[in-house]
Every structure is written in structure tokens, then in C-alpha cells.
């Protein structure tokens, strides 16, 4: 780096990138009392939602709840700017319930900018960072071997300004040497309409940080005034009263709108097949890996060739914009074919395309180079968070940003880092996966990745993490008081239900038996009653068996705790068993493709590698602890079936060899 005696400003922490990871990191470090500068290429596009204008969904909503429970921002902003909310997987168990909010993307960005501008200790800077300044010192290690230690000193911008920093957090998203593709044409860009970050990748290589290349994409936006809504199924907002944030003061004043559903047709599929050679991937123009769980429409047609139709969602990007996001329809096809393709969908036969779909490839830092704190192993006081670590999604980015922000401040305070474990949070599950597995495709958090998913629910994220948020200093006294009040009410109610009995001779008991079809033998506690699958907390209210008017979140928490008490104990035992089974051999003849309790990714990778034992299987990318649990259960069932078959064979042989017994 050039001579930098002319320092523009000095900061405790510099954050590079103003996306969802960068905003959480910067706000976190500033709230904890450290002078922080957030650098971004475009101050008007802070916390932008360049892909779907939505927050939450399966596992992602659990992450948002966790970030909020710790004192982060994403949940509050999603609640304040939501224009539609739905509960996904509501017919399944609470482990996979997920809140998803359609947000007004411009309002979301606007409110984040307001928060940043009004956060003490935080400065916003529009500049492109191209160099990290590193100090090197030599130390004598074991066997008198010299060790070169590297430590961050500051950053330099494209135009030469220098800022000293005690710690740096890189949250560059898709901007590092980003290139967008439409068909066989490409241009340098971090995302559509914004320049890529140039120079920093080269500098990272020079200081010992490796990068690789990934790809993602986003679908076209169409003008809602050109859509024939009569041909579509409406999907209204059904959970406007549900919140990501545990803060009781968060409210939503946004109008609620509907999304709409359409489907691909045989004409859609044929048009894609006829033009596959024009896409960046199938045409061979790029070979970067895209996200497995958010495939392009051409990937869907190729990989699921037997499927006659795919569901497509039309999602509003905001209240005051005509733009509609065509969810599930990302593509790399040329622009003219994209429009033709869109017009094969019911309701879109006359649509006008406002923005074309495009693919974007970018440099990322494989997270195996990071410690659990998200500090790089190579350079002290240098942290990395968000999509640059190989993840995909605003929620994953926000969670990493908060972790990096917390641990950068703790490093400066010479305190131990906060380590999030798999059993404590989805945040811990994600970070553990990132730093231990050599991932070659964008990582998305999934409920199936967690072996503790019944414990790591969205509704109890505050119980798991708010005490930690308070200890760190991100939860204020008012919020802490509200949390303690909620915990007291929850525990008091569980105790009351355990101590209150009903006799089968009581009039209420007779009514309950009549309504539910389940007998009450002798007497039962309200807790035992609530354990029944066809009895809910709402029934306690119905039969006037409550004492206090408890909030819906407390009612839900009480019911889940009681109903799933046994499952939670069994889950814990399964995990302990897994940890003891690392040397258990795996028969080489197993066809993992036939084990449908495994994730698709796990089946594919296990079949390819054929591990010898559980220990080897646990090291394979894409094989989660949840997959190992499922595999262990499958092997047990297999062994029981074999034992039964052997007993049957022995009995048959015994009968044949003793004909006199007949």
C-alpha cells in the first residue's frame, strides 16, 4: 500500500458494504459504543432488496426472530414495512412454522437509512474500498520457527483516501468483481444499475485471503397495470397480526395487499427447451455454481422434466410502485425471449416487462477461512459477514452481520468472542455449516439442516437469546423488563396448568368429553388435557379454564412447551446418540437415494462419496446433523427388519425339520 501519512479519519470499526449484513454490523458496533464507519458504493441503496421483496420463510423466519431476540434490526423493519404476511407450513408441526412478510422495498431501505443516520457513533460514507492496510509482525513460535502475524490497520478508497481502523468487517455482498449476465451478454456490475467493487479481490489475494466464484439470479419485474388479474388466484394477507419482533411496541401501519399465483404452461417449457443454449450456464458462458434451493426456471425445466407445470408467484414490490416481482421465474435467457416467455403464463399474456431477469456472478470468501467468531484466521481484527461468505438471503446476511459486529467489538475490548452453537440457534447452525464444510454453492439456511429444530423454533427465540442480547448490551432496560414479565407469566401459567385438576364428574369435563370425543378417566390436570392432539389453549379459553388474559405469544408458547415435552426429550437423546456413533460403520451397498428422510443434497453427496462410517459422513458437504439423525433411525429400522426376517427364517427352518410336530 502507498504511503498513507495523510489519514482522513480514524475509526474503531470500518464496515465495507451497506447491505443487510453491513447495516446490522454497523448498528451493532455503534450501539456498543465504538466509533463506526459504514462505507458503501451508493448511499441511496442502503439495505436494498435486489431480489425478492420479502423477509422470512422456512428457517429464515427463525433467523429473523433470533436476530431480533439479540437486539438486531431486520425483524423490526420487516414488521414495519410489511404489506402482506402469511404463516407457511401452518398445517405441520411448530418446528417448521414460518412467518413470511412481503415488504415495501423502498420503505424498508428508507427506514434503514433513517436508523443509520440517527445512530450515535455511526458515520456513513459513499466510497469504494479497494485496499486493506495490514501490519505485519514476526514472532518466534514452536521449534524457534518464525511466525508472521497480520493485523488490520486501515482501508483505502478507489480515489486514494485513507481511513485508519482498529477492526474491519467486509460485507460486500455480490459486488466483488460482480458481473451480470443476460443471455450471452454481460457487463461489470454488483447488481443491475450499480457498479461492481473493483480492486479489493486482488488486494485480498495479496494479503492471503482466497476467493472463489458463485452465481445467483433474479427474475423480471412486470407492470401490474398490464396483468389480467381475473385469470389468477389471489393470495391475501392472512397473518398481519403476527410479528418477527418480540418488541411489544412495534406496529405496522402499511396497507395489506394480495399476491397472485400463476403457473407455467407446456408452451413455457417448450420455449425454454428451444433456447437453453442461449443461457449463460447451459450456453457455457459461465460455470459458477448457483443456489440449489432457488433454481432458475430453465434449471427447473431440465431437472424436473417430468413435471408438467411450476407454480409462479406475482409479488408487489411496494405500495407506490407498479412493479411486480415474478417469483420462481429467474432466468438467464436473452431479453426478447424473456418477454415471450412471460407472455406464456396465464394472466401475463399482455404483460409489459419493466426490468429483465439477469444472472450475477461474483467473488466470495470460502468461510472455511473464518473462525466461529467470523474473524478471518489469516488476519487479526478482519471479519467477514453475509453473502461474501457464500450464503444467499437477506436473513442469513443480517444474522452474520450482527455476529461480526458483536465479535469485532469484543475483540477490541479483549473479551472472548460470543460463539453461537448448533444447539442454541439457527445462527449457530449456519455458522458451523459455513466454517466446517467446503461449500461449492450458495448456502441457504433450512430447517432440515438443524438437528435441534423442535427446540429452535421462532416463537421461543427470545427465551433462548434475549438474556444473551441483554448481557452483550444490545437489549435495553425497557425491552428487558418486557421480556422478564413475559417469562414470569409463561412459567406461572405452566405451573397453574400442572396444578389444576378436573374430575370426570365435573360438568366442564362432560362437555369436553362430548366435544372432543376423548374420555377423562378419574381426573386429569389441565396440562395433561393440553397434551391431547385435539385440544388447544383456545379450548381452555372456550371452557373458561383460564385465569389471566394472556397474550397470544404466551398462549402459543405454553401449548407448544406442554404438547412437545416428550418429543424434545427424545430429540436430545437422539443427538447424544449421534455423537457416540461416529465410528459406526455404514454398509457400502446402501442406496441413499432411496432414503427419503434425507435431504436431496445429502442423498446426492452420500451416494457419490459412500462414506465408511458416521464420522466420515458428518464431514461431507450438504450432510447435516439432521441428516445423520435420520440415517441413524433408518439403520435402526433396517436392523429390526433384518432381525425379524432372521427369526422368521429360523422358525420356518425349525418347522420344516420337525414334520412330526404338524
From Swiss-Prot:
GO MF: flavin adenine dinucleotide binding
Binding-site residues for NAD(+), renumbered to this chain: 290-304
GO biological process: tRNA methylation; tRNA wobble uridine modification
Compartments (UniProt record): Cytoplasm
Required cofactor(s): FAD
PROSITE patterns membership: GIDA_1, GIDA_2
Keywords associated with the record: Cytoplasm, FAD, Flavoprotein, NAD, tRNA processing
Highest taxon of source: Bacteria
Gene Ontology CC terms: cytoplasm
Self-association and partners: Homodimer. Heterotetramer of two MnmE and two MnmG subunits.
Known role: NAD-binding protein involved in the addition of a carboxymethylaminomethyl (cmnm) group at the wobble position (U34) of certain tRNAs, forming tRNA-cmnm(5)s(2)U34.
Family: Belongs to the MnmG family.
Record's protein name: tRNA uridine 5-carboxymethylaminomethyl modification enzyme MnmG
Species for this entry: Prochlorococcus marinus (strain MIT 9312)
Gene it is expressed from: mnmG
Amino acid at each position: 500500500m502507498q504511503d498513507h501519512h495523510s489519514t482522513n479519519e480514524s475509526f474503531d470499526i470500518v464496515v465495507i458494504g451497506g447491505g443487510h449484513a453491513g447495516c446490522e454490523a454497523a448498528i451493532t458496533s455503534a450501539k456498543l459504543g465504538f466509533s463506526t464507519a459504514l462505507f458503501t458504493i451508493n448511499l441511496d441503496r442502503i439495505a436494498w432488496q435486489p431480489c425478492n421483496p420479502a423477509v422470512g420463510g422456512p428457517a429464515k423466519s427463525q433467523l429473523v426472530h433470533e436476530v431480533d431476540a439479540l437486539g438486531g434490526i431486520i425483524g423490526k423493519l420487516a414488521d414495519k414495512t410489511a404489506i402482506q404476511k402469511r404463516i407457511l407450513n401452518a398445517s405441520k408441526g411448530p418446528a417448521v412454522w414460518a412467518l413470511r412478510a412481503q415488504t415495501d422495498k423502498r420503505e424498508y431501505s428508507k427506514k434503514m437509512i433513517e436508523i443509520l443516520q440517527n445512530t450515535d457513533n455511526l458515520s456513513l460514507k459513499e466510497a469504494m474500498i479497494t485496499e486493506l492496510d495490514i501490519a505485519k509482525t514476526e514472532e518466534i513460535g514452536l521449534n524457534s520457527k518464525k511466525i508472521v502475524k497480520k493485523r488490520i490497520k486501515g482501508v483505502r478508497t478507489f480515489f486514494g483516501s485513507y481511513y485508519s481502523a482498529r477492526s474491519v468487517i467486509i460485507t460486500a455482498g455480490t459486488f466483488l468483481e460482480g458481473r451480470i449476465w443476460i443471455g450471452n451478454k454481460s457487463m461489470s456490475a454488483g447488481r443491475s444499475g450499480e457498479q461492481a467493487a473493483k480492486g479489493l479481490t486482488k488486494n485480498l489475494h495479496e494479503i492471503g485471503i482466497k476467493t472463489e466464484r458463485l452465481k445467483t439470479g433474479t427474475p423480471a419485474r412486470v407492470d401490474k397495470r398490464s396483468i389480467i388479474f381475473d385469470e389468477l388466484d389471489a393470495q391475501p394477507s392472512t397473518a398481519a397480526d403476527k410479528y418477527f419482533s418480540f418488541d411489544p411496541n412495534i406496529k405496522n401501519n402499511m396497507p395489506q395487499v394480495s399476491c397472485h399465483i400463476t403457473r407455467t404452461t407446456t408452451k413455457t417449457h417448450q420455449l425454454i427447451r428451444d433456447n437453453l443454449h442461449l443461457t449463460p450456464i447451459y450456453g457455457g458462458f459461465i460455470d459458477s455454481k448457483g443456489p440449489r434451493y432457488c433454481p432458475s426456471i430453465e434449471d427447473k425445466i431440465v431437472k424436473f422434466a417430468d413435471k408438467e407445470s411450476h407454480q409462479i408467484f406475482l409479488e408487489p414490490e411496494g405500495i407506490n410502485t407498479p412493479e411486480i416481482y415474478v417469483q420462481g421465474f429467474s432466468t438467464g435467457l436473452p431479453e426478447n425471449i424473456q418477454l415471450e416467455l412471460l407472455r406464456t403464463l396465464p394472466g401475463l399474456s399482455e404483460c409489459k416487462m419493466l426490468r429483465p431477469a439477469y444472472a450475477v456472478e461474483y467473488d466470495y470468501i470460502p468461510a472455511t477461512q473464518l473462525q466461529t467468531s467470523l474473524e478471518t484466521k489469516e488476519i487479526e481484527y478482519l471479519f467477514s459477514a453475509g453473502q461474501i461468505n457464500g450464503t444467499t438471503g437477506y436473513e442469513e446476511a443480517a444474522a452474520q452481520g450482527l455476529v461480526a459486529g458483536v465479535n469485532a467489538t469484543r475483540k477490541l475490548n479483549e473479551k472472548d468472542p460470543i460463539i453461537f452453537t448448533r444447539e442454541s440457534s439457527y445462527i449457530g447452525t449456519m455458522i458451523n455449516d459455513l466454517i466446517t464444510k467446503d461449500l461449492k454453492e450458495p448456502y441457504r439456511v433450512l430447517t432440515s439442516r438443524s438437528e435441534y429444530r423442535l427446540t429452535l423454533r421462532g416463537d421461543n427465540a427470545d427465551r433462548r437469546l434475549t438474556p444473551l442480547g441483554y448481557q452483550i448490551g444490545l437489549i435495553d432496560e425497557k425491552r428487558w423488563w418486557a421480556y422478564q414479565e413475559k417469562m414470569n407469566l409463561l412459567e406461572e401459567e405452566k405451573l397453574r396448568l400442572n396444578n389444576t385438576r378436573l374430575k370426570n364428574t365435573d360438568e366442564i369435563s362432560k362437555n369436553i368429553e362430548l366435544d372432543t370425543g376423548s374420555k377423562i378417566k378419574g381426573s386429569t390436570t389441565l396440562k395433561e388435557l393440553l397434551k391431547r392432539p385435539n385440544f388447544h389453549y383456545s379450548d381452555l379459553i372456550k371452557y373458561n379454564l383460564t385465569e389471566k388474559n394472556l397474550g397470544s405469544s404466551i398462549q402459543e408458547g405454553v401449548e407448544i412447551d406442554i404438547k412437545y415435552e416428550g418429543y424434545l426429550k427424545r430429540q436430545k437423546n437422539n443427538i447424544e446418540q449421534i455423537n457416540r456413533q461416529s465410528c459406526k460403520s455404514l454398509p457400502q451397498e446402501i442406496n441413499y437415494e432411496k432414503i427419503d428422510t434425507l435431504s436431496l443434497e445429502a442423498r446426492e453427496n452420500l451416494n457419490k462419496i459412500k462414506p465408511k462410517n458416521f464420522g466420515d459422513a458428518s464431514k461431507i458437504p450438504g450432510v447435516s446433523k439432521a441428516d445423520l439423525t435420520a440415517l441413524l433411525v433408518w439403520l435402526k429400522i433396517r436392523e429390526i427388519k433384518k432381525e425379524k426376517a432372521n427369526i422368521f427364517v429360523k422358525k420356518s427352518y425349525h418347522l420344516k425339520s420337525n414334520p412330526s410336530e404338524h
